[in-house]
Swiss-Prot record:
UniProt keywords, alphabetically: Immunoglobulin domain, Repeat
SMART domains in alphabetical order: IG
SUPFAM superfamilies: Immunoglobulin
Superkingdom: Viruses
Species of provenance: Fowlpox virus (strain NVSL) (FPV)
The protein, known as: Putative Ig-like V-type domain-containing protein FPV055
Swiss-Prot/TrEMBL GO biological process terms: B cell receptor signaling pathway
Gene Ontology terms: cellular component: B cell receptor complex
Presence of the UniProt keyword Repeat in the record: yes
Domain Ig-like V-type: 25-122, 140-239
Length: 275
């Protein structure tokens, strides 16, 4: 169900004021990532997740967005599940530019109770030299990933940090460049994040990859608190000659020379992985 955004600027100011006074009494809970880092020219959705326990219907959900000190009235879509008492509000920005950078805030008002969240939007230009010099490090920054049609594919970005971040502070988003429009498109299915003390691994799983649709240039964007970094993965299809049999079996003739090869790489958690 979709809720309408109907709130005036003075009402928005009042809601924010009441949030500071009654924050400890509120039933409404709003969550959002503190920092969102996106490639320039892409289409994005800034999202706030809503939770309530008052049994409110969709008509009781009032939402407002601010960019800096100004109210935003376009591109807002709010959904609400009356049964589960959860929902989300999204602010859609098309072809995001550097001018869109800055502070955003969503405010949610339900049956007299309110909550809000602020987030910062960062926009970067993608180039061969794209790299943020901060305490989030993605290794390797660039690498090639081989795939075979029909075989499950997992693309990974291992990252490390100089300090410990909570689960709510760490996010990973995956993007793939469109070969025709040259526009970065966000990948939302198959995204997973595994954390350890000082970093983790973000992955993108494609259960049934195909040459053309799944091959190409991917980008992982990892944010920790108010900083982030990017890594690039080039997915290429193995040729029939370099591909192996589906059952991973090999045959040889008696008396002939035979050599078998395996790939060994270091695990980010210590030790070694044999593929």
């Amino acid at each position: 169900m979709i809720c309408k955004n109907s709130i005036r600027h003075k009402e928005l100011t009042l809601i924010i004021f009441l949030c500071f006074i009654y924050l400890s009494k509120t039933f409404v809970e709003v969550k959002a990532p503190p920092y969102v880092l996106v490639p320039e020219g892409s289409d994005i959705n800034l999202t706030c997740f809503i939770k309530d326990d008052q049994g409110a219907g969709e008509d009781k959900v009032i939402v407002a967005w601010q960019q800096g000190d100004g109210e935003v009235t376009q591109g807002i879509k709010t959904t609400w599940d009356t049964t589960r008492q959860v929902g989300q509000t999204m602010l859609h920005i098309s072809k995001v530019s550097k001018e869109a950078e800055g502070s955003y805030m969503c405010v949610v008002w339900i049956n007299g109770d309110a909550d809000y969240k602020k987030m910062n939007l960062g926009v970067f230009t993608v180039s061969k030299k794209t790299y943020m010099h901060n305490e989030v490090s993605i290794t390797p920054r660039r690498s090639r990933v081989d795939m075979s049609d029909g075989r499950p594919l997992k693309i990974e970005c291992a990252f490390s940090t100089r300090r410990i971040y909570g689960r709510s502070q760490v996010n990973i988003k995956w993007w793939k460049i469109d070969g025709i429009t040259r526009k970065w498109e966000q990948q939302t299915s198959g995204v997973n994040l595994l954390l350890h003390t000082y970093g983790g691994i973000g992955s993108l799983s494609i259960p049934n990859p195909t040459t053309g649709e799944s091959t190409g240039k991917y980008m992982c964007v990892v944010t920790c608190g108010d900083i982030g970094n990017v890594g690039f993965r080039l997915v290429k299809s193995l040729s029939p000659l370099s591909d192996t049999e589906s059952d991973h079996s090999y045959t040889s003739e008696e008396g002939s020379h035979f050599m078998e090869r395996c790939k060994v790489k270091k695990s980010p958690y210590g030790g070694w992985i044999v593929e």
